[in-house]
């Protein structure tokens, strides 16, 4: 396997190697767009004096939430949308939709058709819900590692909706290059879960540093985004 690529075991004959060097310019452009959109959304939210504060959930809240009867999604959405004016929602929604498109474009660039799989949400299918909640791609580590130290590394994408049918989401799945050398490939994956912002650092050199926990970074409201998250490839 080439040192500047990563290899995926797809449980079939042979492997798929992705050479990242060929994508470096395009990835750089996309990441700049994503960073710009993130800053834009953050600035929009910072200008809202009535933006609700989000406190970390405690264990008691988590337990009681599990046993609490769910209200209809429409009443929840109505309460949340009442916080914002129509103009504010429209602005945030446009920014969020553009950001979402750029994230999909980045994923399609990093992981071609052979790796990305379309996920179709069927609310009656428990397995599909699980896949939507956490999509994991498994890769082999750098071939320079000793055989006994080889491990399967993961890029984990988690999408936190709270209620899958509710039109409220948090900023999802930013994947960026931290560094790339002939022997080390570092990929950062960010996601939000249970009101916390997580970053996973995956190092392709027999080492892995995972999950740096931060406070929630961004919340945006979208009335038009497709939360089935069907990846277009």
UniProtKB/Swiss-Prot annotation:
Coiled coil: none annotated. Changing residue 200 to A/E/R/Y: Decreases propensity to stall ribosomes. It comes from the Eukaryota. Signal peptide: none annotated. Changing residue 209 to A: Decreases propensity to stall ribosomes. Residues 196-212 are annotated as: The nascent chain stimulates ribosomal stalling during translation by interfering with the conformation of the peptidyl transferase center (PTC), and the translating mRNA by adopting a difficult-to-decode structure at the ribosome decoding center. Acts as an endogenous target of the ribosome quality control (RQC) pathway. During translation, the nascent chain has a propensity to stall ribosomes, thereby stimulating activation of the RQC pathway. This is Uncharacterized protein YEL057C.
């Amino acid at each position: 396997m080439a040192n500047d690529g990563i290899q995926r075991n797809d449980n079939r004959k042979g492997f798929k190697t992705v050479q990242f060097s060929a994508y470096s310019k395009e990835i750089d452009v996309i990441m700049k767009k994503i960073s710009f959109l993130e800053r834009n959304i953050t600035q929009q939210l910072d200008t809202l004096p009535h933006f609700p504060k989000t406190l970390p959930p405690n264990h008691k809240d988590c337990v009681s939430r599990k046993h609490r009867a769910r209200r209809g999604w429409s009443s929840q959405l109505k309460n949340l949308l009442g916080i914002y004016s129509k103009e504010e929602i429209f602005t945030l929604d446009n920014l969020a939709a553009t950001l979402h498109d750029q994230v999909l474009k980045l994923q399609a660039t990093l992981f071609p058709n052979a790796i990305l799989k379309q996920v179709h949400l069927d609310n009656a299918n428990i397995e599909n819900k699980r896949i939507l909640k956490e999509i994991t791609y498994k890769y082999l580590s750098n071939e320079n590692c000793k055989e006994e130290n080889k491990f399967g590394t993961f890029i984990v994408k988690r999408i936190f909706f709270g209620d899958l049918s509710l039109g409220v989401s948090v900023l999802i799945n930013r994947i960026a290059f931290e560094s790339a050398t002939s022997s080390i490939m570092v990929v950062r994956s960010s996601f939000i879960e249970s009101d916390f912002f997580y970053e996973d650092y995956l190092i392709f050199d027999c080492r892995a540093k995972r999950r740096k926990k931060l406070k929630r970074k961004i919340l945006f409201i979208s009335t038009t985004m497709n939360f089935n998250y069907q990846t277009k490839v």
